[in-house]
Amino acid sequence: MLVVFQRVVRATVLVGRKDTIRTVKTHSGAKKRWILTEDGKSFKRKHAGAQHLNRDTSSSTRARQRQWEEANTIQKRVLKRLLPFK
């Protein structure tokens, strides 16, 4: 009986010894939270904490939570490593 296994190979990186190869994968948490901007140079995300229990917060706080937040310089550097295929 022939069994075929499908493997998702994205990219390979040599690590340490020559016979050790590690697959580069996208960080799934970052993939769900960050999207690439229209110009393709930065990332943006929504604010956390705007889903429920907002009755006692001010209208300016709720309006600020509806806006998009752009990644700063350090976050961009980390996101390039976490999201290698974007």
Swiss-Prot record:
Coiled-coil ranges (or none): none
GO (cellular component) term, any one: large ribosomal subunit
One annotated GO molecular function: structural constituent of ribosome
GO BP annotation list: mitochondrial translation
InterPro entries recorded: Ribosomal_bL35 (IPR001706), Ribosomal_bL35-like (IPR021137), Ribosomal_bL35_sf (IPR037229)
Transit peptide endpoints, chain numbering: 1-18
Disordered as annotated region, ranges: 45-69
Chief location category: mitochondrion
Family membership: Belongs to the bacterial ribosomal protein bL35 family.
Quaternary structure annotation from Swiss-Prot or TrEMBL: Component of the mitochondrial large ribosomal subunit (mt-LSU). Mature yeast 74S mitochondrial ribosomes consist of a small (37S) and a large (54S) subunit. The 37S small subunit contains a 15S ribosomal RNA (15S mt-rRNA) and at least 32 different proteins. The 54S large subunit contains a 21S rRNA (21S mt-rRNA) and at least 45 different proteins.
Function: Component of the mitochondrial ribosome (mitoribosome), a dedicated translation machinery responsible for the synthesis of mitochondrial genome-encoded proteins, including at least some of the essential transmembrane subunits of the mitochondrial respiratory chain. The mitoribosomes are attached to the mitochondrial inner membrane and translation products are cotranslationally integrated into the membrane.
Name listed for the protein in its UniProt record: Large ribosomal subunit protein bL35m
Source organism per UniProt: Schizosaccharomyces pombe (strain 972 / ATCC 24843) (Fission yeast)
